[in-house]
A protein has these predicted regions:
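Conserved "right-hand" nucleotidyltransferase catalytic core of DNA-directed polymerases
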Residues: 1-184, 197-204, 211-214, 224, ...
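Hydrophobic (often cysteine-bearing) scaffold residues that line and stabilize catalytic clefts
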Residues: 13, 214, 234, 238, ...
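Conserved catalytic core of nucleic-acid polymerases
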Residues: 55-62, 243-383, 387-390, 398-401, ...
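Short acidic, glycine/serine/threonine-rich loops at helix termini
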Residues: 111, 217-220, 440-444
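Flexible, glycine/threonine-enriched loop-and-boundary segments that flank and lead into catalytic domains
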Residues: 175-189, 371-384
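Function-dense linear segments that define catalytic or interfacial modules
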Residues: 184-251
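A common structural junction motif
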Residues: 413-422
Length: 445
């Protein structure tokens, strides 16, 4: 190995990064001094949040995450068997040598055997637009399956194409990809969750996850008393929203209705429009898995309106935040970030308004997670644990079984109490789950 070349590269990398810092750091200081707004604090974000977080992630990457090679090996064999079975079955109907992974071949097969029906699916609203006729992506194939029904022979063929593509991608990306990146100690260093495991029987794989973090942040930012009351009393926020959306008693809310209420909850906060909700992938899950009916854009608009009617103070905060962003061309977050909107066109006003509302919610939630990870990384030695990685608003760790009780107390404290904002009576809660691997977990009470 040419370590001399590596040393030379790393030295230049560090030297050039340092030179950049003097330039970029000065720009941040100048912006903080010259730009309007009391909440803008780029150097504070850098010093308090980003640099400590970078060190915590570096430590996690250095330690690595143990993966179960035998699990992924077995999964790879199973996927290869399914891929071969689907390829063989499809060759029977589409001809020898047919490649389900080739968009051109799939398009040719569909055009020759189902072309007129693709146009029918567009006209009946199962596809978004006529451009879908030229596509063979998953969404288009699923739209045709919905048109004909799952048990139709044509649907079974299309489902085999979908399964072939999915299994091939999973095999190449997740199984072979992970095994190819595994080091000699069975760790990788940057569903398959069962392949991410505790290294031995003396350790737990642990995940700490904020509960409904964005919604709690929205309640904190807006100080909406109705939302705050739901969280204080430990009620089900998604169930409450479903009652308001569908005008039904709580005991009559179906799993599909609660699921869609959850999508509306988070969709509004994530800056999604009613049209995006009506045309989103959750509609496939609602119809295919939960037996519900697809929404029209008008229905989605009605449900969004009902959600906001249930939380009027949140609605006013959203309106004020959006107005100020249009006026100022930026929005600040309570922890010092700023998002700029330098080019607001008439056609893009709606998008800008949604992003202005989404930014402080997402930014605060993200910063709280990063700060929690940083603090936990600094304290993990107290229970002989290691931070492995973070996913969305959760942190994964490796903890000795004998130290789980004291570790849980520290984790709950850092996630729920030792946070950088004053929650003003809104409980920020987390769930802790443990298991021998990421696929089989139980909650710690």
């Amino acid at each position: 190995r040419d370590y001399a070349a590596l040393y030379d590269y790393q030295g230049k990398d560090c030297a050039n990064t340092t030179r950049l810092w003097f330039d970029v750091g000065q720009r941040l200081l100048d912006e903080q001094r010259d730009e309007p707004g009391d909440g803008f604090d780029p150097m504070g974000v850098h010093d308090r949040i980003l640099m400590p977080g970078a060190k915590a992630f570096a430590a996690a990457e250095y330690h690595g995450t143990y993966i179960d090679a035998s699990f992924f090996g077995s999964m790879g064999a199973m996927l290869e068997e399914r891929i071969d079975a689907n390829r063989t079955a499809l060759e029977v109907v589409a001809g020898e040598g047919f490649n389900p992974g080739s968009p051109a071949q799939v398009k040719k097969y569909i055009t020759e055997s189902m072309g007129d029906l693709v146009r029918l699916a567009v006209r009946k609203g199962y596809m978004r637009s006529a451009s879908a006729e030229q596509s063979t992506d998953r969404e288009t194939l699923q739209a045709m399956i919905r048109l004909w029904g799952k048990d139709d022979d044509r649907s079974l063929i299309l489902q085999r194409i979908i399964d072939f593509r999915n299994d091939t991608k999973v095999l190449q990306t997740n199984v072979a990809g992970l095994l190819g990146k595994m080091d000699d100690d069975h760790r990788i260093r940057p569903s398959f969750r069962a392949g991410f495991a505790a290294p031995d029987k003396k350790h737990w794989f642990v995940e700490v996850d904020y509960a409904q973090l964005e919604l709690r942040v929205a309640a904190w930012l807006s100080q909406d008393p109705a939302m705050i009351e739901v969280f204080r009393e430990g009620r089900d926020i998604h169930g409450e929203v479903a009652v308001a959306m569908f005008h039904k008693p709580a005991d009559q809310i179906s799993s599909g209705e609660r699921y869609m209420a959850k999508r509306v909850d988070f969709g509004i906060l994530y800056g999604r429009s009613a049209k995006a909700l009506a045309e989103g992938p959750e509609m496939d899950y609602l119809t295919d898995e939960l037996g519900g009916e697809r929404w029209s854009v008008e229905q989605a608009e009605l449900y969004v309106r009902r959600f906001l009617e249930g939380f009027p103070v949140l609605r006013q905060w959203m309106e004020d935040t959006a107005k100020n962003a249009i006026r100022d061309s930026f929005v600040d977050t309570p922890l010092g970030r700023r998002r700029r909107f330098p080019y607001i066109t008439r056609a893009g006003v709606g998008h800008t308004r949604r992003q202005a509302v989404n930014t402080p919610i997402q930014a605060v939630a993200s910063d709280l997670c990063l700060e929690a990870l940083t603090r936990i990384s600094a304290r993990a030695h107290e229970f002989d644990g290691h931070v492995l990685f973070a996913v969305h608003d959760s942190v994964a760790l490796e903890i000795p079984k004998a130290r789980l009780k004291e570790a849980s107390k520290i984790l709950r404290y850092e996630f729920e109490q030792n946070i950088s904002i004053d929650p003003t009576g809104i409980p920020f809660s987390c769930d802790i789950e443990v298991g021998s691997n990421w696929g089989v977990m139980e909650k710690v009470k």
